[in-house]
């Protein structure tokens, strides 16, 4: 069967979850985009996404990408396509148009040009003129303009897939069904249900969370009750294939109700929304399985037949439903007290647009996810309901932890204002680019010589080593102030903030453990999952400044043989593998980082037979004649500035040794290949002899994203090719 490219849209902040879900349907990630993902697979997988995706809004089958730097160019690209393959003879269609550029600033104008192109294309082929139907068309054509390119596709879903068909009435503050599903996945509900856990929502409203929890646990397709999809009159539709998928969904829905069924309960103090929830449950076919009661939190008690483990997930009112902040704080306090009394051993998830009230729950959050409820920023706070996780009014600092304290309020206000400003600029840029790990602050103010990095809701603070001329007591004072201000502005729990002193790394220091917590967690970068550890080493496992270099590698790796020297945790190799590299070899002398790199590749389902990681001294490997016959199309070399590790055959000085290293790499580079050479030695000067031997181009400026442009010397980077290649 032929492969297709699909663009699948979703709520903002759900992209990585969606990519994982679509992979289960046989759709492989091509690239991430804001509020959606590009994937590749067979039509059957696209049908599965329409029927089974709990997270998607729309599934769009890509027809073509055309140039659209002007209205005429857009029209020419559209009219040149074979639209008879996508719009039935004499049928109807409509166009949805998103985006703008300098030439096309109005979406209605853009949509009209696309309509004109489609109609003229079909008429020019001698076929009957199709009609334009704003409502209930046979086919919906999706047009998405991004700068000078227009992506055209067929909307297979036909409607937003968040509409499952069971919710026609709404509570006061409805939560969209696919966002509810995302919250359940982030909270770990599938694993909890599989292990015998139950589900409760203490402020259930119209019942969206509890219904979605039941559909998920019982393996019921979210699109099962939909009567019509956007592909049913599309000429490329395969009715027999679709029928078989519908029959499979019915079989799985029946089988899902066999055996043990978790308990599903929803409570709300408002009897009117409980009545709405009961109707939604009936329409979803979950009567007798999902139960709801009109009961305020203060009167909640655990049922005798509930499991010892489970998930209580709720979306407390905020903003519109309760205007008084004191009342809201009291509500959160009551929620925390009730859960701690009645549901020990359970997990609590609170989805809120007012995360500052999370502290009122009286529990320590172990994870926070930043999401959006419509256009409103919100957070999902997760808690393990255990006595040891209770937050006391004055928790003592752990050994070595900096106790927050403000000695100079005026100075602290300056830092507070700078962080807020950076959140509006760099933070907003990162959100638009769908970047979850970035540098927010880099010694912007001389009083606070810190680097502050965000790792998807956690904060990594590195204090630059102060010169001897700086008073040690004053430096400690300023650091304590920063530790007070940072969690306040960034709205993170103290346990999600890590502070280290950053020093020049010599010899084996970067490989030495600073702690032994073993607290690894996964972050995401341009479609890649990567393991990081904020506490145990001087570095975290991910050099954020090299993000554009890694993404460039991903975009240019398809079909290439990739070599990663001094590979660290293999993040660049992961990008190469995700980008379609035919094979790769990654070398590092650290056993720790070799294992870490292997874990990263496994996280992304890379074939270990094709993507090999070896513990090796890169200097010795490059000098070894036995490896000289290995050829690569793309090589990435990012060596340390200096290393005298006992495991190395010699001492590495990058300024002294780089020319030989480059020549040895070029000896292993295919005739039309590329070496990416990078280092972070601030005083580095490239050997001029290399420019006469090879085609050398410095690309440093293009390898710095917005969050590192304040520090242009953080690394330098060159593209090196064979001459006349």
Swiss-Prot record:
Domain spans labelled THUMP: 45-156
Entry EC no(s): 2.1.1.173, 2.1.1.264
GO cellular component, one term: cytoplasm
GO molecular function per UniProt: 23S rRNA (guanine(2445)-N(2))-methyltransferase activity; RNA binding; rRNA (guanine-N7-)-methyltransferase activity
CDD domains reported in the protein's UniProt record: AdoMet_MTases, THUMP_AdoMetMT
Catalysed conversion reaction: guanosine(2445) in 23S rRNA + S-adenosyl-L-methionine = N(2)-methylguanosine(2445) in 23S rRNA + S-adenosyl-L-homocysteine + H(+); guanosine(2069) in 23S rRNA + S-adenosyl-L-methionine = N(2)-methylguanosine(2069) in 23S rRNA + S-adenosyl-L-homocysteine + H(+)
Assigned keywords, A-Z: Cytoplasm, Methyltransferase, RNA-binding, rRNA processing, S-adenosyl-L-methionine, Transferase
InterPro entries: 23SrRNA_methyltr_KL (IPR017244), DNA_methylase_N6_adenine_CS (IPR002052), RlmKL-like_Mtase (IPR000241), RlmL_1st (IPR054170), SAM-dep_methyl-trfase (IPR019614), SAM-dependent_MTases_sf (IPR029063), THUMP_dom (IPR004114)
Location in the cell: Cytoplasm
Coiled-coil parts of chain: none
Main subcellular location: cytoplasm
SUPFAM superfamilies: S-adenosyl-L-methionine-dependent methyltransferases (SSF53335)
Family that this chain belongs to: Belongs to the methyltransferase superfamily. RlmKL family.
Function according to Swiss-Prot or TrEMBL: Specifically methylates the guanine in position 2445 (m2G2445) and the guanine in position 2069 (m7G2069) of 23S rRNA.
The name this protein goes by in its record: Ribosomal RNA large subunit methyltransferase K/L
Lineage: Bacteria, Pseudomonadati, Pseudomonadota, Gammaproteobacteria, Pseudomonadales
